[in-house]
Amino acid sequence: MLATLAAAMLVTVAPQRQTDTTIAVPAGASLSVNNFGGGITVHGWSENRVKVHAETGRRGRVEVSLVGNTVVVKASSREGAPSVMDFDITVPQSMGVSLSGTYADITVDGVQGPINAETVNGEVNVRGGKGIITLHSIQGSVTLADASGRIEVNSVNEDIALTNVSGEIKVETTNGGIMMTGIQSSSVDAGTINGDVLYEGTVTDGGSYSFASHNGDISVSIPDRANVTVATATANGEIDASFTLPLTSTTGKHRKTFKIGSASARMELESFQGDIKLRRPQELRDRIDRKHKHDQNENENDSDSDSSWHFDLGSVTAYATRYAAAYAPKYAAQYAAQYAPRYARQYARAYSRTYADTYKWQRSRKH
């Protein structure tokens, strides 16, 4: 979707040109792709070759090279201006990949190596991956499924969803919800400012779990035989459990601590404006199923309207520049004083630096 929008913003309609390049790679090789606008799709296969299929306009140019042990793929234009290009790349399954774009959607499927994927305006959707996995988008949702390792996922203005993921997990977004299902981990840290947080997964003995939201509810599953200390805090919400919990301490109405079993794990739940809900795993799974059905119906209703939505790059640039200048310092200061310093740093970093660098570059290209 965003790849199509980027194309509409940056270029006029032009004939598409297709190129195919195949490179044999040694064991342990990696892939690096940079694409300003368009799409990046990466698949895994059993061969020791990298195949790059690209679709671009007549001015676009694809550069594929082997630099040391890294296959480097770049999109460029004969006139030097940013180009819009769609990449479909097939790599050995164990290959590590590093993918970046500005107006680019990123999709990875069937790769079982380390993954780094970053975009400014676009979605990031990954299935698979092992080792260090880092996913980031400013204006786009991020999904990760069937992955394991040390995982860090960030978004600013969209939702994050993790499914069947294991390992050390850190998730942050600013204006979006966080949904984690089928998680197997002894270390989870997830937080958002404007959105709900949902966690359905293991609570491992000796593990550490932290979930926070400023303006949203937190829903967490507690397995029947969990051994965990649950510390909850909310300023303007309720603390609600669907089963009996042994209350060990309370500070006022909105701060309570519960100890379950041997209490060897530690779980901290904090929401400023939302409720904290403790549920059994099956209750959350049923809720998730209902949400998926609801979202599917909404997507079907919205599919026709998406194709008629257009905007121009100049308007977006002007709006984002004003937004970064007017709101980022204000919100950063507000949350630093009122809620959590880590969110203030996240918000200021994401808006002030990323947008400033991106749009400063765009303005410099015009002059």
In which residue ranges do the predicted regions lie?
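Intrinsically disordered, low-complexity terminal regions
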Residues: 1-367
